[in-house]
Swiss-Prot record:
Keyword Lipid biosynthesis annotated: no
Gene: RELT
Superkingdom classification of source: Eukaryota
Protein name per the record: Tumor necrosis factor receptor superfamily member 19L
Free-text function comment from the UniProt entry: May play a role in apoptosis. Induces activation of MAPK14/p38 and MAPK8/JNK MAPK cascades, when overexpressed. Involved in dental enamel formation.
Native source organism of the sequence: Macaca fascicularis (Crab-eating macaque)
Residue windows of the TNFR-Cys repeats: 50-90
């Protein structure tokens, strides 16, 4: 029994002896050098592995690698980029921030909070920059740095500039609204308000820049010119007159397409010069004198060409004569004038007529014409120049004869002629 009892403690001692040796051996194998950390998967045959990017291990040990310090969180610049064996070293504060000198672990504060005399905040005028650019250096692992964002405190100069902008913008807005209001008021009174200079047509490609409808009245302006100018001063009347002229032009094109156009033969030297246009009346009584290379109406350029009515053109081409025939039957479908009126010009619904003076006698006065220094009515040729308007045929009579309007011999008073302008159903008597 005794030998067995002695063997038991000995055997236990021999069994427990290898455990401390084994423990020491395993403990020394798990110590990793700087820049490495223990491998948690020892099945690959390695006990330590390198530190991942963005981490470091500065001494021997079994602890895992630690991440690098982030200087952006402390509002500091990176003085030295971290490696696998060394942490990132932070330097001075960002521009516009202040902090304890030589203590890189303490976060920096904005200069707007700093008292007077703090180093680094005097040159910035105690203002912090918005969106400060960070000197972000790419680390060995390629970690990106995010710039910080700070608050901004305005100084006296910046505040004054903001107040100036706030005061100027409403002033310009009010000036624009005032200009629009004044322009609308002028338009209601009949003025022409434009934002640019109007260039009128001229022989040299330029003009005076004034609308012809708004020019001052000329002393030598004829009666029809005054009437047309007064009518075209209103936009509604001008638009209606344009429609009438378009309708008249369309009728003229239809009529001239079915008959040949007769040309004006050269006139003899003793005949007075006639306007080459031959498409409008210069005065109520007939053709007017010339002023320069063209007629007075064309030189003034205050209205488009006023053409003869379709009835007058048809009467001229069908039966040309020197004197108007008062007994001629009006054309079917044409608008007849009122009793006692003599039509001077008719364009669509626009009609200019002459009203003789109505005497108190029982009979209406008649307009008589006589021919002076010329052949008798029986000797007049039938059609000396076919295709000419009536007023030009009266001027181009043979032998220099001319007609004259006479009053009845019973009356010695001056006859007053009144003219009426009819547009649709409304009349304007002058």
């Amino acid at each position: 029994m005794k030998p067995s009892l002695l063997c038991r403690p000995l055997s236990c001692f021999l069994m427990l002896l290898p455990w401390p040796l084994a423990t020491l051996t395993s403990t020394t194998l798990w110590q990793c050098p700087p820049g490495e950390e223990p491998d948690l998967n020892p099945g690959q045959g390695t006990l330590c592995r390198p530190c991942p990017p963005g981490t470091f291990s500065a001494a021997w040990g079994s602890s895992p690698c630690q991440p690098h310090a982030r200087c952006s969180l402390q509002r500091r610049l990176e003085a030295q980029v971290g490696t696998a064996t060394q942490d990132t070293l932070c330097g001075d504060c960002w521009p516009g921030w202040f902090g304890p000198w030589g203590v890189p672990r303490v976060p920096c504060q904005p200069c707007s909070w700093a008292p007077l005399g703090i180093h680094g905040c005097d040159e910035w005028g105690r203002r912090a920059r918005r969106g400060v650019e960070v000197a972000a250096g790419a680390s060995s692992g390629g970690e990106t740095r995010q710039p910080g964002n700070g608050t901004r405190a305005g100084g006296p100069e910046e505040t004054a500039a903001q107040y100036a902008v706030i005061a100027i913008v409403p002033v310009f807005c009010l000036m624009g609204l005032l200009g629009i209001l004044v322009c609308n008021l002028l338009k209601r009174k009949g003025y022409h308000c434009t934002a640019h200079k109007e260039v009128g047509p001229g022989p040299g490609g330029g003009g005076s820049g004034i609308n012809p409808a708004y020019r001052t009245e000329d002393v030598n302006e004829d009666t029809i010119g005054v009437l047309v100018r007064l009518i075209t001063e209103k936009k509604e009347n001008a638009a209606a007159l344009e429609e009438l002229l378009k309708e008249y032009h369309s009728k003229q094109l239809v009529q001239t397409s079915h008959r040949p156009v007769s040309k004006l033969p050269p006139a003899p030297p003793n005949v007075p010069h006639i306007c080459p246009h031959r498409h409008h009346l210069h005065t109520v009584q007939g053709l007017a004198s010339l002023s320069g290379p063209c007629c007075s109406r064309c030189s003034q350029k205050k209205w488009p060409e006023v053409l003869l009515s379709p009835e007058a053109v048809a009467a001229t081409t069908s039966a040309p004569s020197f004197l108007p025939n008062p007994t001629r039957v009006p054309k079917a479908g044409a608008k007849a004038g009122r009793q006692g009126e003599i039509t001077i010009l008719s364009v669509g619904r626009f009609r200019v007529a002459r009203i003789p003076e109505q005497r108190t006698g029982s009979m209406v006065s008649e307009v008589k014409t006589i021919t002076e220094a010329g052949p008798s009515a029986g000797d007049l040729p039938d059609s000396p120049q076919p295709g000419l308007p009536a007023e030009q045929q009266a001027l181009l009579g043979s032998g220099g004869s001319h007609t004259k309007w006479l009053k009845p011999p019973a009356e010695n008073k001056t006859e007053e002629n009144r003219y009426v302008v009819r547009l649709s159903e409304s009349n304007l008597v002058i």
